[in-house]
Regions:
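Terminal "cap-and-tail" regions of soluble proteins that handle hydrophobic small molecules
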Residues: 2-19, 126-208
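Charge-dense, low-complexity intrinsically disordered segments
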Residues: 8, 12, 50, 107
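Short, aromatic-enriched amphipathic alpha-helices that serve as compact interaction elements
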Residues: 14-30
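Short, glycine/acidic-rich beta->alpha junctions
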Residues: 17, 74, 110-113
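Conserved catalytic-core segments centered on acid/base and nucleophilic motifs
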Residues: 27-28, 40, 118-121
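A solvent-exposed, acidic/Ser-Thr-rich amphipathic alpha-helical stretch
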Residues: 34-99, 198
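Hydrophobic/aromatic beta-strand elements that line small-molecule binding cavities or substrate pockets
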Residues: 77-82, 115-121, 134-135
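Exposed beta-sheet edge and beta->alpha loop/turn motif
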Residues: 88-124, 138-160
Length: 208
């Protein structure tokens, strides 16, 4: 039996509930269903992404403000893998964050490829999210109209990490402070540190 195969009906039900919890949280973010999104997080959860670090409820408040400012992120999600350990679990999936942007006067879509890692915990019989982290892989910028070109010089992005360089560049232009020490494939040791933290919290070995 593999580490991710459920051993009984209870584990299968837990995995299904966690999967639906994550999908509900991301759908609520995309569709501005803010109270539903808020209900997905435990109050003492920890969220660490490019533009935000804090608890889940405050993350929702920040997302509301981001949407109000005209930065409506949408998410493309791959299948979710849940690793269960009693009342705790880690879920991972590949995700692409799409942001409609205007840069240098040209409308485009900024797409950031990441691996999302969620921590979930069951309390009083219900699962809630305890954490959300992203491992940044790469990003890309696609103008809305074929043939248009957005020119960004190396000098403009020299202070930003390669794995989320364009995202950092855009968020910085919108007044956001971006953490330059987040987990990313361009600095493998940052990924190793995150995996040790999350899998240690869950009490299960890191996959090999």
């Amino acid at each position: 039996m593999s580490e991710t195969s459920p051993n009984n009906l209870t584990e299968s039900a837990d995995i299904t509930e966690i999967t639906q919890l994550i999908l509900r949280e991301r759908e609520s973010r995309d569709l501005a269903r803010w109270e539903t999104m808020r209900e997905c997080f435990w109050p003492d959860s920890l969220i660490r992404v490019s533009w935000f670090r804090g608890n889940g409820p405050d993350f929702v408040t920040g997302s509301i403000e981001m949407a109000r400012r005209g930065i409506p992120a949408k998410h493309r999600l791959a299948p979710i893998l849940v690793r269960l350990a009693g009342d705790r679990a880690i879920a991972s999936l590949h995700g692409i964050i799409d942001l409609p942007v205007v840069l240098k006067g040209i409308r485009a879509t900024l797409s950031t490829h990441s691996r999302f890692l969620y921590r979930a915990e069951k309390r009083e019989g219900a699962w809630g999210l305890m954490g959300f982290d992203a491992i940044y892989m790469r990003d890309e910028l696609t103008p809305d109209l074929p043939g248009q070109v957005i020119t960004i010089s190396p000098e403009e992005t020299k202070d930003f990490r390669r794995s989320y360089r364009l995202l950092s560049y855009y968020l910085h232009s919108q007044g956001y402070k971006v953490d330059s020490n987040l987990p990313g494939e361009d600095v493998p040791e940052t990924v190793d540190v995150l995996y040790r933290e999350l899998f240690g919290w869950c009490g299960i070995p890191i996959p090999k």
